[in-house]
Curated annotation (Swiss-Prot):
Source organism: Mycobacterium bovis (strain ATCC BAA-935 / AF2122/97)
Biological processes, Gene Ontology terms: DNA-templated transcription elongation; regulation of DNA-templated transcription elongation
Protein name per its UniProtKB record: Uncharacterized protein Mb3817
Pfam families xref list: GreA_GreB (PF01272)
GO molecular function terms noted in the UniProt entry: DNA binding; RNA polymerase binding
Superkingdom assignment: Bacteria
Length: 161
């Protein structure tokens, strides 16, 4: 599936990056579709069922991201207007309650996490990722953790080009 897509308003490097990510996600989706089809009618324990549900959920998330990238390649970027999630490729700088300042890279799919950079990677649909959406630098943002609510100060947001 290598179709040439004309994009308005995207630099060549950004378009190439998005096209490469789109191809990678489509390959992952194709593999997952086979696994999900094989899951149907499977008899197994609760762990197998949980893995099947996780694969189906990931397939839905991949579909959303593929549609977003396809749209972005066809029409160009849309201004960030505080949607429900930060776009993949966004860089956020946060100050945590202990004073630590961390720059994190937003990803859409967990498999995009660079090896060795797990601590600086933030998934867009995580509690913190969703809480940051719609906020501006200078805002204090509250998000849920297993230990209860936590807060960070959003220092900077750099959207993907």
């Amino acid at each position: 599936m290598s179709e040439k897509v004309e994009s308005k308003g995207l630099a060549d490097a950004a378009r190439d990056h998005l096209a490469a990510e789109l191809a990678r996600l489509r390959q992952r989706r194709d593999r997952l579709e086979v696994e999900v089809k094989n899951d149907r009618g499977m008899i197994g324990d609760h762990g197998d069922a949980a893995e099947a549900i996780q694969r189906a959920d990931e397939l839905a998330i991949l579909g959303d991201r593929i549609n977003e990238l396809d749209r972005r390649l066809r029409t160009g970027p849309t201004p960030w207007s505080g949607s429900e999630t930060l776009p993949g490729g966004t860089e956020v700088t946060l100050r945590f309650p202990d004073g630590e300042v961390v720059t994190m890279h937003v990803i859409s799919v967990v498999e995009e996490t660079p090896v060795g950079r797990e601590a600086e990677t933030l998934t867009a649909r995580s509690p913190l990722g969703q809480a940051l959406a719609g906020h501006q630098p200078g805002d204090t943002v509250t998000y849920s953790t297993p230990q209860g609510p936590n807060q960070v100060q959003l220092l900077a947001v750099k959207l993907p080009s």
